[in-house]
């Protein structure tokens, strides 16, 4: 018998906001494989990997079993982040647009994502299995090849 199943860590059910101010929760995607890229508009390695992320998203966007998200930590008061890691929402969205990002950009609220996923560096990649457990996490930049491989490994 495998003990890895017993050690599976349940992913924290975060609540974030999308660009239109709508609430987005991890539990909205129950039963799906979820990939989340934590990034910041000032982060060089984040900017360099975004074209790789976008290529991966284009390959996967029609796959109904996979959810591709990005998370940021804006300093606007509406998000109530006590220790925001980025500038305001408009700066973040402009940077995303400039870099050709078409996947969803979410905004952390009350630092819940950063705290509960123990984000210490940017970028950080979180991979969540369809049963809601953490599949993997990678700190640092990724390539399209690595990202695709990690998403394919999710159960």
Spans of model-derived segments:
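Conserved redox-active cysteine motifs that mediate thiol-disulfide chemistry
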Residues: 38-55
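Short pre-active-site segment immediately N-terminal to redox-active cysteine/selenocysteine motifs
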Residues: 32-34, 39-42, 75, 121
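Short, flexible/disordered intra-domain loops and linkers
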Residues: 75-87
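N-terminal targeting signals for export/organelle localization
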Residues: 1-13, 155
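Thiol-/selenol-based redox modules, centered on thioredoxin-like
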Residues: 121-155
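Short, internal strand/loop/helix patches
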Residues: 84-128
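A short beta-strand-turn-helix
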Residues: 13-34, 57-59
């Amino acid at each position: 018998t495998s003990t890895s199943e017993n050690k599976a860590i349940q992913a924290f059910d975060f609540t974030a906001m999308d660009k239109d101010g709508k609430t987005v929760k991890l539990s909205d995607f129950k039963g799906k494989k979820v990939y989340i890229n934590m990034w910041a508009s000032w982060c060089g390695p984040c900017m360099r990997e975004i074209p790789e992320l976008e290529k991966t998203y284009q390959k996967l966007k029609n796959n109904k079993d996979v959810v591709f998200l990005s998370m940021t930590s804006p300093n606007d008061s509406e998000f109530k982040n006590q220790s925001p890691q980025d500038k305001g929402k408009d700066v973040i969205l402009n940077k995303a647009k400039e870099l050709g990002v078409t996947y969803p950009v979410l905004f952390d609220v009350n630092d819940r994502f950063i705290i509960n996923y123990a984000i210490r560096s940017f970028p950080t990649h979180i991979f969540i299995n369809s049963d809601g457990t953490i599949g993997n996490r990678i700190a640092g930049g990724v390539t399209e090849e690595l990202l695709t491989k990690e998403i394919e490994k999710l159960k």
